[in-house]
Amino acid sequence: MTFEMLYSKIHRVTITDANLNYVGSITIDEDLAKLAKLREGMKVEIVDVNNGERFSTYVILGKKRGEICVNGAAARKVAIGDVVIILAYASMNEDEINAHKPCIVLVDEKNEILEK
């Protein structure tokens, strides 16, 4: 049996842009994404702390430092300046669960890394 477990999280990151006309996804600063063990194309859940919206999308790696841009239709679910939590999950069996520790990245209001 497998269970869906928290794999990684970027906690309280700030939305820097929302691009309705892009083809979907969330663009995440590449350094921040790698620190959180997120891969391009990986499914993530976004939780907007400001308005309570929750939605799923996939990761695109961004080049700009601190960039967090929600793209496509999901851009209607956030506003620039909103604080969100980016969550990734993984399927794990009992042995993997016992050995796993989620990767949690904390950032400040400018999306600068505070701690991992």
UniProtKB/Swiss-Prot annotation:
The active site is at S25, Y58. Binds 1 pyruvoyl group covalently per subunit. One of its GO terms (cellular component) is cytosol. SUPFAM superfamilies: ADC-like. It is found in: Cytoplasm. It comes from the Bacteria. Substrate binds at T57, G72, A73, A74. Its EC number is 4.1.1.11. GO terms for molecular function: aspartate 1-decarboxylase activity. Pfam families: Asp_decarbox. The keyword Transmembrane does not apply. Its cofactor is pyruvate. Catalyzes the pyruvoyl-dependent decarboxylation of aspartate to produce beta-alanine. Belongs to the PanD family. Heterooctamer of four alpha and four beta subunits. This is Aspartate 1-decarboxylase. It comes from Helicobacter pylori (strain Shi470).
